[in-house]
């Protein structure tokens, strides 16, 4: 029996990826304990579900602080009080400083709605369409000081269909996000994936030269 890994999740919005994590825990597929959900937005809809389940929810509104430095100092102190082994950014829409990210080096994951390194940043789906890409997807990666630049762990590929707009493409990509984020967290909790001293990903004891890719039908890569 693996001792549940203590986790803190950061969100800014609906929290659908958080819900996917909660569902995986309920299905005994994820050996973690969510100790707290923290949002930088008091109106984040994603705070409602964990609160109903008795998970601690905390709002640290970035708009209430004079600078990013002060905001992050409060955020870091709050997170560290829960002694997490992993910090998950599940739709957390704030750029974090190098100092903050370095504090959690090797134990902070993010989900991004593109096949990184392509299309980091915002407005991903429209940019994919504007570029005429035939494929998009989602990536779980370790967080480093470079925005969306940390080494990828796991990806899911999503075809771009005729007639797609940004909303339709985003919907299908989000379905895959809900699959790969809990899986990558499970790998981390089981000790299968780590960030090495040189900034590379180690998977099952060997360097991961390229991200694992979810198989058709949502099957875990062999």
Labelled PLM ranges:
Residues 8, 27, 123, 197-222:
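Internal anion-binding site segments
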Residues 39-40, 63-64, 68, 82-98:
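N-terminal glycine-rich "phosphate-gripper" loop used for MgATP/nucleotide binding
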Residues 24, 86, 90-204:
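Donor/substrate-binding cores of folate-linked one-carbon enzymes
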Residues 18, 46-47, 72, 125, ...:
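A general structural signal for well-ordered alpha-helical segments in protein cores
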Residues 1-45:
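N-terminal Rossmann-like dinucleotide-binding module
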């Amino acid at each position: 029996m693996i001792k549940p890994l203590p986790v803190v999740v950061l969100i800014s919005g609906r929290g659908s990826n958080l819900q996917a994590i909660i569902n995986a825990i309920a299905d005994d597929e994820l050996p973690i304990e969510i100790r707290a959900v923290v949002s930088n937005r008091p109106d984040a809809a994603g705070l409602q579900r964990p609160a109903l389940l008795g998970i601690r929810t905390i709002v640290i509104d970035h708009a209430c602080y004079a600078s990013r430095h002060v905001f992050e100092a409060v955020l870091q102190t709050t997170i560290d009080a829960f002694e997490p082994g992993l910090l998950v950014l599940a739709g957390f829409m704030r750029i974090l400083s190098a100092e903050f990210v370095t504090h959690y080096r090797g134990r902070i994951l993010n989900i991004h709605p593109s096949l990184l390194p392509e299309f980091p940043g915002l407005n991903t789906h429209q940019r994919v369409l504007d570029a005429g890409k035939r494929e998009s997807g989602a990536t779980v990666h370790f967080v480093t000081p470079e925005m969306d630049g940390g080494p990828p762990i796991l990806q899911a590929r999503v075809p771009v269909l005729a007639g797609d707009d940004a909303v339709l493409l985003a919907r299908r990509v989000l379905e895959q996000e809900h699959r790969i984020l809990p899986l990558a967290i499970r790998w981390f909790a089981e000790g299968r994936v780590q960030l090495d001293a040189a900034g590379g990903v180690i998977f099952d004891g060997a360097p991961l030269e390229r991200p694992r890719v979810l198989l058709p039908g949502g099957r875990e890569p062999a």
